[in-house]
Amino acid sequence: MALAANRLFAASPAASGPATAFDDETVPALARALAARAYAAPSTVLPAWLADISYDQYRDIRFRGDHALWHDDGLRFQAQFFHRGFLFKEGVTMHVVEGGRSRELPYRSADFEFGPSLHPSGDDAALGFAGFRLHAPLNRPDYFDELCVFLGASYFRAVAPGLAYGLSARGLALGSGDPGAEEFPRFSQFWLETPAASADHVVVHALLDSPSVAGAFRFDIRPGEVVAFDVDARLYPRKPLPNAGIAALTSMYEFDAGDRVGTDDFRPAVHDSDGLSLVNGAGEQVWRPLRNPAQVEHCG
């Protein structure tokens, strides 16, 4: 059923607008239709007070935790949202799904706190969101830790109990390592399925778009000692994709304690990840340490 008026709390963001039918084929149908049309680049226009802010100023825009989606519903999950600005100038459209019906989640400036270095001008109702993050009780039952983040292009990342963020995943990589410019498909819309009261997982749908391809993604996210993402991805190319990275991972590495050639830095290491650990199709465990070569290298 659609969200009922008596379930919408003033503090929490409330889905609005007409309810539309939604199921697992809704986003794939949108992606197919999108791929049949010419690509339309998203607007990056922002008001002056947001257009050229610094990293520190962007971090000074905080979503109010007590305004989180599902905050008052007694569920295992809550959702908070990121503001547009800094590197994240393109807006994304957020939807909430409940009972097979979807409604758009409107932007409200009252859901955010703006630090003293920022000077919002009016309500700016058309600003919209840049992304979102999910929270769940990972490390103790009475606190909602950050579980995962979807922010920027098709990037997403997650963190398990007692750990810190490392690498990020990407919905799709196009032209990584090629001599020419890399293409960055972006998630333009998200649908958050309202989980059942006893649910131990949450489902997110995303619509992907870029000059070369449209796509539909379904993420079944299950927290625990190991945080698991079951991902269903369907791609609808507008043109041939000669170098597409499926299930791509990305991280940051400058140097490590054993790889300091040409480095004059007091820090022992600077990286988010220092290697790739994987299990291949034969069941072998493989460890590949990262390095920072002078030229781009490809490893098969």
What are these regions (language model features)?
Residues 32, 36-178:
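Solvent-exposed N-terminal domain segments of exported/luminal and surface proteins
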Residues 56, 149-151, 158-165, 242, ...:
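A contiguous, surface-exposed recognition patch within enzymatic or periplasmic domains that forms
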Residues 11-22:
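Cleaved targeting-peptide boundary
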Residues 99-101, 194-198, 223-226, 238-239:
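A short, structured loop/turn motif at beta-sheet edges
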Residues 55, 89-91, 129, 187, ...:
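Extracellular structured ligand-interaction cores
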Residues 1-13:
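N-terminal export signals
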Residues 206-252:
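Acidic, contiguous internal or C-terminal segments within carbohydrate-active enzymes
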